[in-house]
């Protein structure tokens, strides 16, 4: 199929009323060709735009990033290996979650710095290893 130039169309700004079709069967029988302009193209943002928006959103917020119940299940599962039938106060699990999220955010910040130092924008496992090694957590 040959390429053709598309001309800009002016928008009226008002919503066009839809044609009411009696049943789903009638809708399936009427083919809509893509060349007639009946099918609307799905809007997609450029790569990285949504990521930057999410970064700004999470930097503004102070709420917890991990959902509470999955974190609670993880804590109970890990504690089960040391002693069975342990009970936790909700404040204790909240404190564990605050501390672990603060640790992970700090680790990812250091990991990002390691990736930037290597002239990359993508973090890799070796960046995490280097960040932990510099911190003195792992030799």
Swiss-Prot record:
Modified sites of kind N6-acetyllysine: 5, 10, 15, 19, 24, 28, 40, 60
Keywords associated with the record: Acetylation, Chromosome, DNA-binding, Methylation, Nucleosome core, Nucleus, Phosphoprotein
PTM-bearing positions, type Phosphoserine: 11
CDD domains hit by this protein: HFD_H3
Sites of N6-methyllysine modification: 5, 10, 19, 24, 28, 40, 83
Region listing for Disordered, in residue ranges: 1-43
Summary of the function given for this chain in its UniProt record: Core component of nucleosome. Nucleosomes wrap and compact DNA into chromatin, limiting DNA accessibility to the cellular machineries which require DNA as a template. Histones thereby play a central role in transcription regulation, DNA repair, DNA replication and chromosomal stability. DNA accessibility is regulated via a complex set of post-translational modifications of histones, also called histone code, and nucleosome remodeling.
Name of the featured protein: Histone H3.3 type a
SUPFAM superfamilies attached to this UniProt entry: Histone-fold
GO biological processes: chromatin remodeling; epigenetic regulation of gene expression; response to mercury ion
PTM annotation: Acetylation is generally linked to gene activation. Different methylation states of H3K4 mark distinct developmental phases. H3K4me2 is associated with euchromatic regions. H3K4me3 is a mark of active chromatin. set1 is responsible for all mono-, di- and tri-methylation of H3K4. H3K4me facilitates subsequent acetylation of H3 and H4. Methylation at H3K9 and H3K27 are linked to gene repression.
Compositional bias segments (type: Basic residues): 16-27
GO molecular function: DNA binding; protein heterodimerization activity; structural constituent of chromatin
Superkingdom, taxonomy of origin: Eukaryota
Subcellular locations according to the entry: Nucleus; Chromosome
Family assignment from sequence similarity: Belongs to the histone H3 family.
Originating organism: Dictyostelium discoideum (Social amoeba)
Modified sites of kind N6,N6-dimethyllysine: 5, 10, 28, 40, 83
PANTHER family per the UniProt record, alphabetical: HISTONE H3
Disulfide partners: none
Positions carrying N6,N6,N6-trimethyllysine: 5, 10, 28, 40, 83
Subunit and interaction comment: The nucleosome is a histone octamer containing two molecules each of H2A, H2B, H3 and H4 assembled in one H3-H4 heterotetramer and two H2A-H2B heterodimers. The octamer wraps approximately 147 bp of DNA.
InterPro entries on file: Histone-fold (IPR009072), Histone_H2A/H2B/H3 (IPR007125), Histone_H3/CENP-A (IPR000164)
One Gene Ontology term, aspect cellular component: nucleus
């Amino acid at each position: 199929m040959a390429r053709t130039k598309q001309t800009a169309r002016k928008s009226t700004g008002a919503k066009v009323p839809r044609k009411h079709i009696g049943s789903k069967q009638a809708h399936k029988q009427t083919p809509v060709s893509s060349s007639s302009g009946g099918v609307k193209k799905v809007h997609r943002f450029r790569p990285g735009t949504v990521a930057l928006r999410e970064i700004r959103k999470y930097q503004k917020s102070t709420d917890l990033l991990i959902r509470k119940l999955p974190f609670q299940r993880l804590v109970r599962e890990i504690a089960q290996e040391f002693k069975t039938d342990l009970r936790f106060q909700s404040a204790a699990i909240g404190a564990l979650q605050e501390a672990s999220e603060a640790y992970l955010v700090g680790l990812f910040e250091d990991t990002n710095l390691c990736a930037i130092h290597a002239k990359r924008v993508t973090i890799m496992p070796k960046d995490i290893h280097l960040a932990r090694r510099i911190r003195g957590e792992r030799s």
